[in-house]
Amino acid sequence: MVEPLKIGVLLSGSGTNLQAIIDAAGEGLPVDIVRVVSSRPDAYGIERARAAGIPATVLNRGVYADPEAADARIVAELREAGAEYVVMAGYMRKVTPVMLEAFPDRVDRKSVV
């Protein structure tokens, strides 16, 4: 049996990408979504996460002094949850080196470019 990958999901909107991952996991994809972090409090993806029993956090970068501080907080949330990989599922913010260095080669970088 394959150990599931523990993933954290970052999102900013409706969460359709998150839902696709949730559905695929239900059909046998070996992933365990350990935390969802949203950049917006009104993102419907938060509701999708909670409906699936996945802990969800809203982290508004506006309350942090700089983007690096915000990413450091996101990294702390993901590490606390045990995330090994990060999936950017419609995340509409640029990530800083803080995030990329915390999860080297473990961030879905296609969304970063």
Please tell me what each predicted stretch does.
Residues M1-V113:
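One-carbon transfer enzymes
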